[in-house]
Amino acid sequence: MPLTEQCQISDLTAFEMVKGRKIVDFTTSAIESFEAPKINPLNSTAGEQWEFDGVSEDGMQSFVFGFYRDPNYAILGTGNFRLSIEFAFANRTRFYEVYYASRSVVEHCSVGTRGEWVDDADGYSFSFQIKADMSEAMVFLNSPSAKGTVAIKSRARPVTADGHVWPAHNASTEGVPFYHWSEPIPAGDVEVDVMIQDHPLVFQGMGGHERFWSAFSWFTCLTHLSAVRTMLGPYVLTYFSFTSNINPGETRQSVVLFKDGLPVFRSTRAEASDVDDYALVSKTYGGAVTGTLKDKVTGYQLELVSPGRMQHYTFFVEHANLGFEYILGEGVGGSGFSGHSRGGHVGLSQYQGIALTEALTFPKNSPLFRSNYVA
């Protein structure tokens, strides 16, 4: 992606941030590009992430990449630029590495956005390129143990936290208070061509891309997170649910369904209604694949209902392989699964496809997770 014209460039080193209690720019707009840096400059509490993920056509292989600018992860390494690389293979083994880059550069231009996390001393660089309309993304891996490219081409439209298609003046990027989220690529076609420790991994399937940014640490803002991304037949379905830690008990969800690239359903309502569109989402149990955490979820069921338009969609997701798992104590943590999906409009054609799910629960008491809320 040639970046030939004037660009906004954010070039930071690993420990570069403002000192003390100083207000920094924190963008919450649902109009501007989701890819531009949202926090400028960094301070000691706020952080942001560019996330990319994908699942193979058979539902057995997956990847998740996280590009972070977040001082809250400094407790786990050195500096503010955490970068995580995760792959799950069909034989149920996994590859996982974390890097702490010395430098992060994000160039935001009219043709698109390019980010690079690099450490010349340790000999690695990881980068991404995203078109201005957020229809395509490329990720480039270059380290001693992971090399190659991942290409994602969207089959939907970028959406805000409340499910509106970008750009939208009446939309919100707030998942829960102080925690913001958007989905530049709800789902699309992915092509993976990488070498992991000299072993080739090549597959096609479904990919997606998320953006997260928060004024405080995830633990400060959240107690729970759940997500489903699936692509089947003409449909792309995305679901996210967040439970606030700052406003105890407050849960917000967002469900959007695309058909042939266009939105056909959106709702933030989690209770049944005779008038308003709503989505009932529940975990399912008793399947073959689960993780080691206390919650032995093996899939999801999603009921999307529009009383006014006489529409009712039902989708099922069943886990096929564990993509990643973080044990955070007290039997809880974060886990992600690749899997299979089926569903469609009730009484009409039904389809089969692939899915990625994620669930996160923070422990109630841990010395590693303390609130950094500042009034």
From Swiss-Prot:
Please give one Pfam family short name.
DA_C
Say which domain of life the source belongs to. Answer: Eukaryota
Under the GO molecular function aspect, what terms does this record hold? isomerase activity
Pathway given for this chain reads: Mycotoxin biosynthesis
Keywords, comma-separated and alphabetical: Isomerase
What InterPro entries does the record point to?
Answer: DA_C
Q: Recorded E.C. number(s)?
A: 5.5.1.-
| Annotated family | Belongs to the Diels-Alderase family.
Q: What does this protein do?
A: Diels-Alderase; part of the gene cluster that mediates the biosynthesis of a family of the mycotoxins cytochalasins E and K. The hybrid PKS-NRPS synthetase ccsA and the enoyl reductase ccsC are responsible for fusion of phenylalanine with an octaketide backbone and subsequent release of the stable tetramic acid precursor. The polyketide synthase module (PKS) of the PKS-NRPS ccsA is responsible for the synthesis of the octaketide backbone. The downstream nonribosomal peptide synthetase (NRPS) amidates the carboxyl end of the octaketide with a phenylalanine.
Q: What is this protein called?
A: Diels-Alderase ccsF
What is the species listed in this Swiss-Prot or TrEMBL entry? Aspergillus clavatus (strain ATCC 1007 / CBS 513.65 / DSM 816 / NCTC 3887 / NRRL 1 / QM 1276 / 107)
Ranked from the top, the taxonomy reads: Eukaryota, Fungi, Dikarya, Ascomycota, Pezizomycotina
